[in-house]
Amino acid sequence: MEQILTVLAGQPNCGKSTIFNMLTGARQYVANYPGVTVEKKAGSFVCGDTRVELVDLPGTYSLASWSPEEMAARQFIVEEDPAQIVAVLDASTLEKSLYLCLQLLEMRRPTLAVLNMMDVAAKRGIRVDADALSQALGIP
């Protein structure tokens, strides 16, 4: 069975841990304030003939700053060289999410974007065209 390393990256409170829990069946604590995921969390799941090792990186707004969370996220991506990065974008604060997403794309690793918090965005009157965003970023 093939095994690949995948990381979830995104700003605090964008739903990374919820996605991680859904995919891995883990029960990582999810709270509604920044800094909950200070350390990376790991789990796995099987998709077809592939075992996906999934790592939930600490929430961060940028890879350029020097907070412990930002350093841990950048260091993990550089040193562990994941097969793919899942950039979890908060649709309700898309501009902030895109800043980190663009930095992740600059690292030249296979990356895909997941729009999360669409319900929150809709309640705020925010509409996101996922297809146009995907085309603009050049990633699925």
Regions found by a protein language model. Give the residues of each.
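Conserved G1/Walker A P-loop phosphate-binding module
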Residues: 1-68, 78-80, 84, 106
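Conserved C-terminal guanine-recognition region of P-loop GTPase G domains, centered on the G4
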Residues: 43-49, 72-140
